[in-house]
């Protein structure tokens, strides 16, 4: 292992160790991965932004899209580091200009996301960023919005992946390359 690879492995371990696990939240049997504990640690937060930015520095990305709300906390600094624009995807009624919307299925019901119609241009190469990848439903809806506006989504980045919930496989089937800093077993 090179010095650089060793340092990266240490940073990834530090990031993972900074994420607290809350058992039985929000309901019994769930192990909740609390990314806010990473945000409280400036060294871990900075390392996560640095590693994501370095990973995509040569990707040709022209926009970074972050999903409400924690995707904003990671997506905006990554966009800034890459020197590209940041685009928020939000719940209905939160964006002031003209929007399009996409509904998606949840475990019990549906939810909807919106994006400004002028925020993505045809041909934009888009990186979608969120804090956590579970089933992939939120990201799938976000990708549909971007593609409807003519953007090309080939990358999605996450701090945490929960592989057992199938989100990465779901997105990979749609041609989206997923990159996560850390993975946790369980859900």
From Swiss-Prot:
<dbReference type="InterPro" id="IPR005764">
    <property type="entry name" value="Ade_phspho_trans"/>
</dbReference>
<dbReference type="GO" id="GO:0044209">
    <property type="term" value="P:AMP salvage"/>
</dbReference>
<dbReference type="GO" id="GO:0005737">
    <property type="term" value="C:cytoplasm"/>
</dbReference>
<keyword id="KW-0808">Transferase</keyword>
<dbReference type="InterPro" id="IPR050120">
    <property type="entry name" value="Adenine_PRTase"/>
</dbReference>
<comment type="function">
    <text>Catalyzes a salvage reaction resulting in the formation of AMP, that is energically less costly than de novo synthesis.</text>
</comment>
<dbReference type="GO" id="GO:0003999">
    <property type="term" value="F:adenine phosphoribosyltransferase activity"/>
</dbReference>
<protein>
    <recommendedName>
        <fullName>Adenine phosphoribosyltransferase</fullName>
        <ecNumber>2.4.2.7</ecNumber>
    </recommendedName>
</protein>
<comment type="pathway">
    <text>Purine metabolism; AMP biosynthesis via salvage pathway; AMP from adenine: step 1/1.</text>
</comment>
<dbReference type="GO" id="GO:0006168">
    <property type="term" value="P:adenine salvage"/>
</dbReference>
<dbReference type="Pfam" id="PF00156">
    <property type="entry name" value="Pribosyltran"/>
</dbReference>
<comment type="subunit">
    <text>Homodimer.</text>
</comment>
<keyword id="KW-0328">Glycosyltransferase</keyword>
<dbReference type="GO" id="GO:0002055">
    <property type="term" value="F:adenine binding"/>
</dbReference>
<dbReference type="GO" id="GO:0006166">
    <property type="term" value="P:purine ribonucleoside salvage"/>
</dbReference>
<keyword id="KW-0963">Cytoplasm</keyword>
<dbReference type="InterPro" id="IPR000836">
    <property type="entry name" value="PRibTrfase_dom"/>
</dbReference>
<dbReference type="GO" id="GO:0016208">
    <property type="term" value="F:AMP binding"/>
</dbReference>
<dbReference type="InterPro" id="IPR029057">
    <property type="entry name" value="PRTase-like"/>
</dbReference>
<keyword id="KW-0660">Purine salvage</keyword>
<comment type="similarity">
    <text>Belongs to the purine/pyrimidine phosphoribosyltransferase family.</text>
</comment>
